[in-house]
Amino acid sequence: MIQMQSRLDVADNTGARSVMCIKVLGGSKRRYAGIGDIIKVTVKDAAPRGRVKKGDIYSAVVVRTAKGVRRPDGSLVKFDGNAAVLLNNKLEPIGTRIFGPVTRELRTERFMKIVSLAPEVL
């Protein structure tokens, strides 16, 4: 569960290391975001020669949460931390590589690119 002020790791090669959620998109009173949800983030820590700079604001999709996601068969997929992938205005990934596993829940038409770039799909 990601809410405003939550810090997330970045699971792509854009140069951002850490981001902070500044808004959960999808409704005026929406408080939490889970895996597959789009959020607005600001870059808090970035690599010196990366594509993004500290303070930049981007959309991002949540790809891993410590809270996890419940499957229809009753199983629960959890991760050690929270991670997101930065998106451009067309909701396409900015980076060309994805680090770490992602879940099958991202397998919608919007995020097939992220699933295909990921080294492991759980």
UniProtKB/Swiss-Prot annotation:
Gene name as annotated: rplN
Family: Belongs to the universal ribosomal protein uL14 family.
BP terms from Gene Ontology: translation
Stored InterPro entries: Ribosomal_uL14 (IPR000218), Ribosomal_uL14_bac-type (IPR005745), Ribosomal_uL14_CS (IPR019972), Ribosomal_uL14_sf (IPR036853)
Signal peptide region: none
UniProt source species: Aromatoleum aromaticum (strain DSM 19018 / LMG 30748 / EbN1) (Azoarcus sp. (strain EbN1))
Entry protein name: Large ribosomal subunit protein uL14
Entry-linked Pfam families: Ribosomal_L14 (PF00238)
HAMAP family reported for this sequence: Ribosomal_uL14
NCBIfam families, sorted: rplN_bact
Keywords for the protein's UniProt record, in alphabetical order: Ribonucleoprotein, Ribosomal protein, RNA-binding, rRNA-binding
Role: Binds to 23S rRNA. Forms part of two intersubunit bridges in the 70S ribosome.
A GO term for molecular function: structural constituent of ribosome
Keyword Ribosomal protein: yes
GO cellular component terms listed in the entry, alphabetical order: cytosolic large ribosomal subunit
Oligomer status and interactors: Part of the 50S ribosomal subunit. Forms a cluster with proteins L3 and L19. In the 70S ribosome, L14 and L19 interact and together make contacts with the 16S rRNA in bridges B5 and B8.
Source species, domain of life: Bacteria
